Amino acid sequence: MVTSDRVYYDRMQAMRGLSSSDVAFPAYASRRRIPLVGKQMRIGRRSAARELQPEIDLAVPPIDPGISRLHAMLIAAPDGTWSVLDPGSANGTLVNGREIPTGDLVTLNEGDRINLGAWTVITMYRG
């Protein structure tokens, strides 16, 4: 499930010393359910110039300005579990409030929250 996270946004704004006029929290944000399929799913913003079309495309309104073109990747394990990896995004990726080091693979569980960008959260659900 992809949506916005006000608590994360407020925390990041305070940590970075920004005001809401620097990067405004969206007035609306739909909830998008995206089924996880295949061996990996890229998370980011599509770019025609770079011929990049991530499977979880966050270049839809409201567009989170903190999302990199290739921000993170979800990688499937043979047992059906998923892990997340940040390949070097500009603003980092958090799992359950903890920043994950670039290049580290973090196994995900039901209900885990992946925060990225200025306000985006992806919550992991089965089925």
Where are the model-predicted features located?
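Forkhead-associated
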Residues: R31, P35-R113, G117
